[in-house]
């Protein structure tokens, strides 16, 4: 079985919230795809409930695209501690952390229910499992802790 990088990461050494560049892959024509670890809560100490995480996912899908070029996808980890962000090209972890911080600020302080995309039976595979209240509260908690652009030391972005 292929080795998966995220399963070799020592989850006891990281200091969430943080942004970490996992890998940059190069395609046959030279195109680069970057994979980032957007870790919102400390592994094995906390997990975001599914309804809040689901709503954050739907909001980040648009908000990160507004702030970063080349966003392909932002998908939650099964452990519910954060997200994979996949982009075309390369962004610094500082740039990604600032985009994440700005997105979470919008979720925490500006977003209304009508701003959340994909909350109907037609547009979401689990449309009943959303909570804007939870998304806002978790976003505030993460912002209060500060988002670091380094996974193993706290270097909080402005």
From Swiss-Prot:
The keyword Electron transport does not apply. GO terms for biological process: quorum sensing. GO terms for molecular function: iron ion binding; S-ribosylhomocysteine lyase activity. Fe cation binds at residues 54, 58, 124. Its EC number is 4.4.1.21. Keywords: Autoinducer synthesis, Iron, Lyase, Metal-binding, Quorum sensing. Its cofactor is Fe cation. It holds the Pfam family LuxS. This is S-ribosylhomocysteine lyase. It comes from Limosilactobacillus reuteri (strain DSM 20016). The lineage of its organism: Bacteria, Bacillati, Bacillota, Bacilli, Lactobacillales.
């Amino acid at each position: 079985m292929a080795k998966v990088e995220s399963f070799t990461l020592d989850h006891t050494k990281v200091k969430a919230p943080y942004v970490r560049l996992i890998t940059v892959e190069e395609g046959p024509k030279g195109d680069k795809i970057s994979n980032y670890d957007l870790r919102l809560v400390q592994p094995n100490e906390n997990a975001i409930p599914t309804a809040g995480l689901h709503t954050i996912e739907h909001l980040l899908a648009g908000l990160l695209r507004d702030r970063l070029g080349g966003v392909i996808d932002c998908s939650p980890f099964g452990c519910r501690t954060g997200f994979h962000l996949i982009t075309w090209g390369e962004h610094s972890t500082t740039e990604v952390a600032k985009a994440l911080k700005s997105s979470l600020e919008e979720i925490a302080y500006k977003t209304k229910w009508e701003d959340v995309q994909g909350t109907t039976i037609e547009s979401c595979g689990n449309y009943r499992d959303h909570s804007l209240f939870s998304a806002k509260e978790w976003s505030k908690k993460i912002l209060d802790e500060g988002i670091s652009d380094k996974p193993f030391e706290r270097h909080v972005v402005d």
